[in-house]
Amino acid sequence: MRCLPVFVILLLLIASAPSVDAQPKTKDDVPLAPSHDNAKSALQHLNQRCCPTFYFCCNLSGG
């Protein structure tokens, strides 16, 4: 029963500690885009790249 206050205080200290990144940021770090944007961008790139040669891929973007 004596350990409970110590345990609670430790939890509060851990929760209020500032977060530290595991890996330092470099100048090359780029924020990630949402996966929906990545898929849309990939389809647009695919359309631009293959449509002049392969017409079946022109309808992949749904438009």
UniProtKB/Swiss-Prot annotation:
Residues 1-22 form the signal peptide. It holds the Pfam family Chi-conotoxin. The keyword Protease does not apply. Keywords: Disulfide bond, Ion channel impairing toxin, Secreted, Signal, Toxin. Residues 23-49, 61-63 form a propeptide. It comes from the Eukaryota. It is found in: Secreted. InterPro entries: T-conotoxin. Is not hydroxylated. Contains 2 disulfide bonds. GO terms for cellular component: extracellular region. One of its GO terms (molecular function) is toxin activity. The keyword Disulfide bond applies. Expressed by the venom duct. Belongs to the conotoxin T superfamily. The cysteine framework is V (CC-CC). Probable toxin that inhibits ion channels. This is Conotoxin Am5.1. It comes from Conus amadis. The lineage of its organism: Eukaryota, Metazoa, Spiralia, Lophotrochozoa, Mollusca.
